[in-house]
Amino acid sequence: MFSRAALLTAQRPLTVAATRSAAAAAAPGGAIERRQRPEHPGKVRLGFLPEEWFQFFYNKTGVTGPYTFGVGLITYLCSKEIYVMEHEYYSGLSLGIMAIIAVKKLGPVIAKWADGEIDKIESEWKEGREAELKVLSDAIEAEKKEQWRADGALLLMEAKKENIALQLEAAFRERAMNVYSEVKRRLDYQVECRHVERRLSQKHMVNWITTNVLASISPQQEKETLNKCIADLSALALRVKSA
């Protein structure tokens, strides 16, 4: 275990470094860049050491650099009693060995079983999602069909309105023609009546004038008129012969 003094000594620099790193992580504009969650975990060695640590040492110390650094660090911690080996250390070492054996032996089986369960759950979710997408797509198609039918109903309603308007127009024209025929017939009747009245009036007037004129002519005037007419005709005949 690490000693309490070493932990207290290292606590302040770690806090300052964490504060500086948090301040440096914030962007100048106040926006923080979010990390993306990796799909697969990174590569490790010895079960818990990241591969990036080894790559960092490879460029500077070669292949044996990480292992030399690790052995030297452990030796330094143990020799300076920063890391004290008490009874819990050996218990932890035993548990670590058992855990490593369990991971090596049972890990692949458990991982295979867990992957199968995950695949099963994923397939169920995928089937449910595909079924839901199918239901939604069918609902969309049905809605489009209903909208098309609604548009057809509107067109049918417009056609019915136009048909009714044409029927009303035909009825109006028929009634207007009937009114025109009736008015023309009555006007023709009135015109004919006026013509008959005018002819009757003319006939009565001619008869009245003729009767009065004949009544006013005496037998002597009639005789003189006839003699004058005969004389005029004789003179006209002589003129025609001389010509």
Swiss-Prot record:
Keyword annotations from UniProtKB, A to Z: CF(0), Hydrogen ion transport, Ion transport, Membrane, Mitochondrion, Mitochondrion inner membrane, Transit peptide, Transport
- Origin: domain of life: Eukaryota
One Gene Ontology BP term is: proton transmembrane transport
- Name any GO cellular component annotation: mitochondrion
Keyword check for Mitochondrion:
yes
Subcellular location per UniProt equals: Mitochondrion; Mitochondrion inner membrane
Task: Provide the primary localization.
Answer: mitochondrion
Q: Name one GO molecular function term.
A: proton transmembrane transporter activity
**What residue ranges carry the coiled-coil annotation?**
none
What's one Pfam family the UniProt record gives for this protein? Answer: Mt_ATP-synt_B
Self-association and partners: F-type ATPases have 2 components, CF(1) - the catalytic core - and CF(0) - the membrane proton channel. CF(1) has five subunits: alpha(3), beta(3), gamma(1), delta(1), epsilon(1). CF(0) has three main subunits: a, b and c.
Q: In which family does this protein belong, per the annotation?
A: Belongs to the eukaryotic ATPase B chain family.
Functional note: Mitochondrial membrane ATP synthase (F(1)F(0) ATP synthase or Complex V) produces ATP from ADP in the presence of a proton gradient across the membrane which is generated by electron transport complexes of the respiratory chain. F-type ATPases consist of two structural domains, F(1) - containing the extramembraneous catalytic core, and F(0) - containing the membrane proton channel, linked together by a central stalk and a peripheral stalk. During catalysis, ATP synthesis in the catalytic domain of F(1) is coupled via a rotary mechanism of the central stalk subunits to proton translocation.
- Protein name, UniProt field: ATP synthase subunit b, mitochondrial
Species per Swiss-Prot/TrEMBL record: Drosophila melanogaster
In the UniProt record, the gene name given for this protein reads: ATPsynB
